[in-house]
Amino acid sequence: MERALGLPAEEDLFHKSLAASAKRMESAFRSPPGLDLSHPRDRQPSPLACYEAPEPEALLQPGVGGDPLALPPGSVCVKYGESASRSSVAESSGGEQSPDDDSDGRCELLLRGAGGDPRDASPAAGGGGGGGGGGGGGPGGGGGGGLKAAEGGCSNGHGHGGSKKSKEQKALRLNINARERRRMHDLNDALDELRAVIPYAHSPSVRKLSKIATLLLAKNYILMQAQALEEMRRLVAYLNQGQAISAASLPSSAAAAAAAAAALHPALGAYEQAAGYPFSAGLPPATSCPEKCAIFNSVSSSLCKQCTEKP
């Protein structure tokens, strides 16, 4: 109701300031014949009116309500949400009006009346409310700080857990690497010992055998030793049995070759490549073990060890 009652005074002040600015612009611009500036009520206020410099006479006039310290009407330009006159008319009529197309809402006239305007108190009340809200937000802020502290503690706990897990993984990886390193050292030492006993050219000029070559050479050496051992077992078994093959069982050519070999060396007949290691007919038949050992005098003494041990 107070704002509705104060409408005529505000309109009079607005029109007075607009008339003063129109008189000042009359000297620079001539009005066309069809334009009448004597009735400013029919014109819409220009949004640039607040940026125009007021006349000296208007500045020297006392403020509204006779207050010499108050600013004259039309000299204050602020950013206001809606025009004062438009809001007053909308409140008094009980309806809403659409804003003008040429007004951008950035600069409006703030008219101060002699009495206290309720709109002047609204920012203060809003400020007080904001202050109260800020005061009320204090405990909430404290709660937010406590929540942040709790989150920080949780993150720190996760960080410590992650660091402990990473340390355990690092220690496990170091143990695995050390065990693998020891295993490779043991394997290299074993291969070096195997190279030392395998009969192959050992000299600084010979390239060191690789692991695969060392294993292949050891395999061939073992097979060769097994074959030699099998042949030696056959010879020892024949010597123990005391069997002799007569010359009639051999062909004439084979008998002649065996006789010639026996004439050169008595021990060559024992290593003929015939089944059962037959002896040549040129050798006298030996029935006892000492006689056999006397015939094969070139064979190692280990073959006739059992003959020497007998009484």
From Swiss-Prot:
GO terms for biological process: axon development; positive regulation of transcription by RNA polymerase II; sensory organ development. It holds the Pfam family HLH. Keywords: Nucleus, Repressor, Transcription, Transcription regulation. It is found in: Nucleus. SUPFAM superfamilies: HLH, helix-loop-helix DNA-binding domain. Residues 22-170 are annotated as: Disordered. The keyword Nucleus applies. Residues 125-147 have a biased composition (Gly residues). Its main location: nucleus. Residues 81-96 have a biased composition (Low complexity). One of its GO terms (molecular function) is DNA-binding transcription factor activity, RNA polymerase II-specific. The keyword Ribosomal protein does not apply. InterPro entries: bHLH_dom, bHLH_transcription_factors, HLH_DNA-bd_sf. GO terms for cellular component: nucleus. Residues 171-225 form the bHLH domain. May act as a transcriptional repressor. This is Class E basic helix-loop-helix protein 22. The gene is BHLHE22.
